[in-house]
């Protein structure tokens, strides 16, 4: 692979490569850079705003989303319990987010009646909680990939409390999922990715923990809801003492969504100079032209 920081590049491509956010670089030591992002992914709790309206009323949707973003983990956990009880017995209860009180509607409408669980979880898909969700506690100790790759024993020891917070969060999600925990929960035939997406898209759950890559799957399952979807931050019960990254706070971690790059365009340094130049021109066009950006954001749904 060609190191974009030292190679002789076309000026337009060099500008594109140099403009990459350091956190999105394909790097092993924090200095080199070997790729241009294929896409940028972000994940959290995907929710249909119309389902929020079915729970707290249409007039309260915007304030719910605003207050949710800055709510604590304890407030979120209480909200999950209240919604779970609402699904099971239909009793409306009050809950607070960022100190503001909301009330679950006394009578369920048709949309709320369809709810069977708070979360849709693809239990058989280990990447959803083993590759993605677990990155949140890792981010509390390591500022970037290079730091994690070169971790010391002392840094690894600092992961203990963040991992406990992760386990509590995972327990909250799976214990309030539409699929019951047990052997069937990790059965790929009955509780895989497609089944989880279908449960959410068809209104059986309030949340699904996924990212923007899920858009096309949700659209294929139920195109009527894609225009009213949003992504909310994942909450974890961190203490400030658990955070080892300078300048990072519990409030920031619980009010923002993780953004990362999982795939890259990499230039093969073994090919001809002509092929290298054509590849650079293509990537410049794809990432800077109006037509190229249209394909990335609209056709590829990134």
List PLM regions with ranges:
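Short helices/loops that flank or line small-molecule/ion binding pockets
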Residues: 1, 52, 75-87, 108-110, ...
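Hinge/lid segment of periplasmic solute-binding proteins
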Residues: 1-44, 100-114, 232, 240-250
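Extracytoplasmic/periplasmic substrate-recognition and gating elements
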Residues: 31, 222-301
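Glycine-rich, aromatic-lined ligand/substrate-binding cores of catalytic
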Residues: 170-175, 195-218
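Extracytoplasmic "Venus flytrap"/periplasmic binding protein-like
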Residues: 1-19, 50-55, 59-62, 206-207, ...
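Glycine-centered hinge/linker elements that transmit conformational signals in sensory
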Residues: 77-80, 144-190
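Extracytoplasmic/periplasmic solute-binding protein
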Residues: 25-39, 43-45, 74-151
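A local structural motif
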Residues: 60-67, 171-191, 204, 224-228
């Amino acid at each position: 692979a060609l190191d974009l920081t030292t190679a002789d590049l076309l000026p337009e491509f060099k500008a594109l490569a140099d403009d990459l956010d350091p956190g999105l670089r394909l790097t092993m030591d924090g200095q080199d850079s070997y790729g241009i992002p294929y896409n940028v992914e972000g994940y959290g709790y995907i929710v249909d705003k119309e389902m929020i309206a079915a729970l707290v009323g249409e007039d309260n949707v915007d304030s719910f989303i605003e207050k949710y973003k800055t709510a604590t983990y304890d407030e979120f956990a209480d909200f999950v319990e209240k919604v779970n009880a609402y699904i099971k017995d239909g009793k409306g209860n009050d809950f607070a987010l960022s100190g503001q009180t909301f009330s679950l509607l006394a009578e369920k409408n048709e949309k709320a009646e369809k709810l069977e669980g708070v979360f849709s979880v693809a239990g058989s898909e280990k990447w959803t909680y083993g590759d993605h969700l677990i990155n949140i506690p890792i981010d509390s100790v390591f500022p970037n990939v290079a730091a994690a790759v070169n971790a010391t024993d002392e840094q690894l020891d600092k992961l203990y409390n963040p991992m406990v917070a992760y386990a509590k969060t995972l327990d909250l999600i799976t214990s309030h999922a539409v699929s019951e925990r047990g052997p069937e929960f990790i059965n790929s035939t009955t509780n895989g990715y497609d089944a989880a997406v279908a449960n959410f898209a068809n209104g059986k759950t309030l949340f699904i923990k996924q990212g923007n890559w899920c858009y096309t799957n949700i659209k294929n399952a139920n195109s009527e809801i894609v225009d009213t979807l949003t992504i909310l931050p994942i909450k974890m019960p961190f203490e400030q003492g658990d955070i080892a990254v300078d300048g990072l706070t519990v409030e920031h971690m619980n009010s923002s969504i993780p953004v990362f790059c999982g795939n890259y365009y990499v230039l093969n340094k073994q090919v001809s100079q002509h092929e290298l130049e054509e590849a650079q021109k293509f990537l410049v066009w794809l990432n800077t032209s109006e037509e190229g950006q249209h394909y990335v954001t609209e056709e590829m749904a990134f």
